[in-house]
Every structure is written in C-alpha cells, then in structure tokens.
C-alpha cells in the first residue's frame, strides 16, 4: 500500500504515476467500506484507495502494471532469498482491490503452500470476510481478493473488553466471544484466520486489564484452543505489560 518517504525509489520515481499524486497533499479517509459499499460515492472510494495513509507514507499505485510487476518480483525475490513461509500485508483493504488481488494470486500461484495474512482492521465480520479468498460475500460482487487469511479483529475486540464486564447483561460479557464464533459461517476458511490478543498497533492486554493474571490466563486459553492461527506478540509469552504511548 505504501512506502516510506525516504525510500530511494521515491526520490527518483520510475514513472510519475508510480505513486498516487494530487495537486496538494491528500490523505486517505480511512473508509475501507467504500471498497464494497454499493452506495459509496466515487470521490470517497478514490480517496480511500489513493490517499496517502500519512504524510510520510507515499501511496503506491497498484493499478500501474509496472508497479504491480515490481511488487510481484520483489515479493518472489524475498521468498527465495529468506526462505519465507508467509507475508503479513499491512493495510490490505486500502489497496487498489483489483491490483492487490492480482498480486496475491501471482504469489500463491507460484507458491501454493505460502500463506498471506492481510491486515483488514474492521469491526464487522461480514466486512472482514469479504477480503478472504473465495468469500461467499465478495462473490456477490464478482470479486475475489485471493487472500488466504485475514486478522480476526472482532475476536480481539471481544477479548479486550469482556473481562471487565463483571455485571454482564444479555449482550455483555463472554457472550461477545461466543457470538464472534457463531459468525464463522461468513468466512470461507475460519481455520486460517489469524487470532491475537495484542500486537504492535494495539494496547497490551495486561496494560488494559491492570496486570490481572487470571484474566490474562483466560484470554490466552481462548487464543490457544480456538480455531485459527494464534499470533503471539513479543512479550506475550511472559505476560508483558507496557504503555503504548511510551513504547510497549
């Protein structure tokens, strides 16, 4: 989706349209739902896909065949050089959806057992499921992202709230975790979701719950025993806390 402003190629662009450029600075509106919203305006959709994430991150133009070819060749080089088993693709749902689907298919066609997880930071399972390969939801719009895995942000949302809801009502408490799993039918492959309780973008679980070890044990037990592929953030294995504003 983006590079850093100091990347050497940004300083000497191969083509003018290698990145998305505007008369002035244009930042994304972060409205990922415009990618599939039948009522979205063209302006909102374009700004979501083409706007820069922040000023220091020039937005790559995946609709440019030269860019797409470069990204594909670069990915294959890294897989071969470092003997990689998978990629995590940042801000997957901000990309040109046609271009990123072509890139993902090219990689998985070349390496059928290679896994790619996309950061689809949304809070609705139907919207997240849209981005997984062979989605029944995206098929309604004749789209297939070819992405094997997405991150289970709704499970993360539940785990970082339920253990503080001691006086749970009908819709609070552990029912949130249960409801998350009842919606697995929306995914084409729920067993290939990436599950987590914390990562580099979120608060530390033990910071949220004030280092309550029993709550940490319960969350980790759910993570270790549910469907999906669990991801441990560095320090999770020892229950590390940390203030995100001070560098966790």
Give the positions of each predicted feature.
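C-terminal substrate/ligand-recognition segments
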Residues: 224-236
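Substrate-binding/active-site clefts of carbohydrate-active enzymes
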Residues: 1-76, 81, 102-110, 120, ...
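Active-site-proximal helices and loops of the catalytic beta/alpha 8
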Residues: 12, 74-76, 80-85, 91-188, ...
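A structural signal for short, well-ordered beta-strand segments and their strand-loop junctions
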Residues: 88, 117, 196, 231-234
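Active-site-proximal cap/lid insertion segments
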Residues: 39, 43-48, 52, 166, ...
